[in-house]
Amino acid sequence: MTIGVGVIGYGLMGRVHTYAWRTIPLLYNGEPCNIKLVGVCDVNEQAAEAGREQAGFFFRTTDYREVIHHPEVQVVDICVPNRWHGEIIREALQAGKHVYCEKPLAYSYEEAKELAALAREAAKRGIKVQVVSEYRFFPATMKAKELAQSGFIGRLFHFRGCYLHSGYIDPNRPLEWRLRKEIIGGGVLVDLGPHLLDLMLWLLDGVDEPVAVCGMTETFIKERPLPEDPTKKAPVEVDDAASALIRFKSGALGYVEFSRVATGTEDELRFEVHGDKGAMAFNLMEPNWLWVFDRTQPPSEWGFKKLSTVQKYPPPAAYPSPKFTLGWMRSHVHAQFCFLDAIVNDKPAKPDFDDALKVHELMEAIYRSAQSGNWVSLPLEK
């Protein structure tokens, strides 16, 4: 069986996804299917041509509709800014194509509700959808999920997490698309937030759930140079940093923090989960390990222990050997393998648009709380 893939948007993430599509057959012994890179689209014609030349796509275009409606394309991979996710998803689902979409799912919470409903209808026709959440697909986080679901934590007391970057500290960094509300829909909360919030909801699914949030946001650098004319500046309308207190259904407490101006950080996604029986901790900058504390052991055995998770992916993952160290790109490869496996073998594709909607709901609640100064209850619609 051969599945044809069309990639829409050939910037950073388009290249990452293309790398993964090309790598899957090598790492999984040809499972679950053959992959054909059919079409690549970018509004920048040079970028589209680079995709055709470098990655071997059959054709390139500046019109995403040509990718969607090509008869050999079964999977539409969306790697464009948030503003255009919705229109591409609508057309792809209507055309009967499976959709793999970068996070966040939509430009807004309202649009996310609409797209999730469309995906539910499309599922009745056998169409699969998945939103990119690559941090679910590290062996360390997969092990954390297994432990959380097994009861290892016991009664949840605390969830703490952060995702910190430093790339926007320079006030002379231009007002690019990630800083423009009309394109991205928000700031760091919609840029980095979906990664950590999805991990939290996924890890604690069936264990506990958020029932209220109290959020704060801040824009530290109020204006930036315009890309087209650096001598002129314009206001920044999105947040540089965001944080939220979370109350869970059981009474457990949570705290999440996001920043693109955290001096000294690179790609710091960290979380800690503490319960009455055990605890877990993970840091993306040390992706080959999961730290665990087992309080059910005798006190003489207490202490955090480092579990080696490296590249311990389940079969049919065959290469490289599980003993070798892990990199960020490998998680994308496994995420996209799982999406193809869901299509070929009719399995659930996760995270789907309903999972992404829950993330959008959390982000919307945090923004509403930050604006009002009050706690906001969940779910938003009862």
What residue ranges belong to the model's regions?
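N-terminal Rossmann-like dinucleotide-binding module
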Residues: 1-55
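Short, well-ordered amphipathic alpha-helices
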Residues: 16-27, 115, 145-146, 197-201
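C-terminal glycine/acidic-rich active-site capping loop/insertion
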Residues: 217, 225-239, 243, 247-248, ...
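Short acidic low-complexity segments
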Residues: 29-31, 59-72
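Glycine-rich phosphate/pyrophosphate-binding beta-alpha loops
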Residues: 194, 257-266
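Predominantly a Rossmann-like dinucleotide-binding segment in NAD(P)-dependent oxidoreductases
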Residues: 125-128, 135-236, 290, 373
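Beta-strand-loop-alpha-helix segment that lines the small-molecule cofactor/substrate pocket
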Residues: 2, 74-75, 81-136, 151
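Glycine- and charged-residue-rich phosphate/anionic-cofactor binding loop of Rossmann-like
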Residues: 34-37, 342-359
